[in-house]
């Protein structure tokens, strides 16, 4: 399916959802059931074929074609079982226990009780500027779910406690009530199909070819048909967040995350990597990140970053709506918030152990980036040496060398 057809199907699902929400959900459930029916049908066909062939061979009837049938039935059975029992990797990061961060787990429990949501089974702390709840299928396509919450250390550094709790309420909002359970079931189903589609990409043989043909037809249509449901779920999660913490707090969290995550990507990381010019060994970023994220971003940068964020339209590449649409749905002002105060930092939810986790992620970052840092240090050394050479001969430089010198200085100052 090409992109134009996919977008067309997404728009049809959005219109269907707007015209008749219950009817749309029934159609989504029916299309999901079609995938289940295909898996069960393949499982029964392969099992029946295996039983028939083995029974025939046990009664002395042997034909060369039986070998091919055994291989085909075995391949189909294996593919069906893979579809029923997809295995997912655990989230990256460090698993937190209630004893590590009592205040965090108490806050999660309060949110759970207020929205009457299911329990979070495992909580992970990672290095992303994000928070997310993922529900991995416990039994593949056929039910069960393990709820994982991933919390980014930079996010804890950037927000005060109320705004961070608004983010947690948004994430927990994905699991609330009957609609949440239906959306979570569709989400788990989508994950299972996506993994099966990925795992079978390079398989060969007639059984794999038939399975791939079905997936090429079914999976993009399933993704398009469920897109409106996933988009609705984001707005509903925002609504839950606004209801629990207040619309102003939820909106301020969205805006502050948009601006500060942009600042980290465009300003902090380039500046941090420039330290490789003077430092041969990698330097952990999170101690300095903590101090800088506790400050207000530069005014000009913040205003321009917000303008850019508000210009981004909601498209089919991401089920998350754009910032403008999310703020409008919350009926909130599209302006810069008062920045989070470091005296009420969400990092305090980790308790006295926050310094330990910062040191842990600094050490891990240095380990993961040691080779790249070494190469960057050597590269900046060559740039600096060449810049010094051209600076010494500046009066004799050609126009091309002057342009080269300007480019080298820009790289050193980046």
Where are these regions (language model features)?
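Hydrophobic or amphipathic, alpha-helical segments that drive membrane association/targeting
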Residues: 1-138, 145, 338-340, 344, ...
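Cytosolic-facing loops and C-terminal tails of multi-pass membrane proteins
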Residues: 1-20, 207-230, 239, 243, ...
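A hydrophobic membrane-anchoring feature enriched in long, contiguous, low-charge segments
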Residues: 46, 81-84, 185, 189, ...
């Amino acid at each position: 399916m090409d992109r134009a057809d996919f977008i067309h199907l997404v728009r049809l699902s959005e219109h269907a959802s707007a015209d008749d929400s219950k009817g749309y959900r029934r159609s989504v459930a029916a299309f999901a059931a079609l995938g289940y029916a295909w898996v069960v049908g393949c499982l029964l066909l392969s099992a029946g074929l295996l039983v028939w062939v083995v029974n025939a061979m046990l009664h002395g009837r042997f034909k060369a074609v039986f070998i091919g049938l055994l291989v085909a039935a075995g391949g189909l059975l294996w593919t069906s079982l893979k579809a029923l029992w997809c295995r997912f990797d655990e989230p990256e990061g460090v698993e937190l226990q209630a004893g590590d961060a009592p205040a965090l787990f108490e806050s999660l429990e309060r949110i759970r009780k207020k929205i009457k949501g299911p329990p979070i089974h495992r909580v992970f702390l990672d290095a992303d500027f994000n928070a997310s709840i993922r529900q991995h299928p416990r039994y593949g396509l056929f039910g069960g779910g393990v709820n994982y919450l991933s919390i980014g250390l930079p996010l804890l550094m950037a927000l005060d406690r109320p705004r961070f709790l608004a983010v947690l309420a948004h994430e927990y909002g994905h699991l609330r009530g009957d609609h949440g359970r239906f959306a979570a079931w569709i989400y788990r189903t989508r994950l299972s199909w996506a993994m099966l589609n990925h795992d079978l990409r390079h398989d060969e043989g007639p059984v794999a070819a038939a399975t791939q043909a079905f997936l090429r037809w079914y999976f993009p249509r399933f993704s398009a048909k469920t897109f409106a449901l996933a988009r609705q779920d984001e707005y509903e999660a925002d609504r839950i967040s606004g209801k629990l913490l207040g619309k102003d707090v939820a909106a301020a969290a969205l805006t502050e995350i948009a601006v500060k995550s942009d600042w980290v990507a465009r300003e902090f990381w380039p500046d941090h990597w420039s330290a490789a010019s003077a430092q041969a060994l990698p330097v952990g970023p999170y101690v300095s990140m903590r101090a800088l994220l506790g400050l207000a971003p530069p005014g000009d940068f913040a205003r321009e970053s917000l303008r850019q964020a508000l210009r981004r339209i909601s498209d089919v590449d991401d089920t998350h709506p754009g910032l403008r649409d999310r703020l409008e749905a919350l009926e909130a002002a599209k302006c810069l918030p008062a920045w989070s105060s470091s005296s009420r930092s969400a990092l305090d939810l980790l308790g006295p152990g926050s310094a330990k986790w910062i040191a842990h992620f600094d050490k891990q970052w240095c380990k993961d980036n040691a080779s790249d840092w070494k190469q960057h240090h050597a590269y900046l050394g060559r740039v600096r040496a060449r810049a010094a050479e051209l600076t010494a001969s500046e009066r004799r430089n050609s126009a091309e060398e002057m342009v080269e010198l300007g480019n080298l200085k820009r790289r050193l100052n980046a």
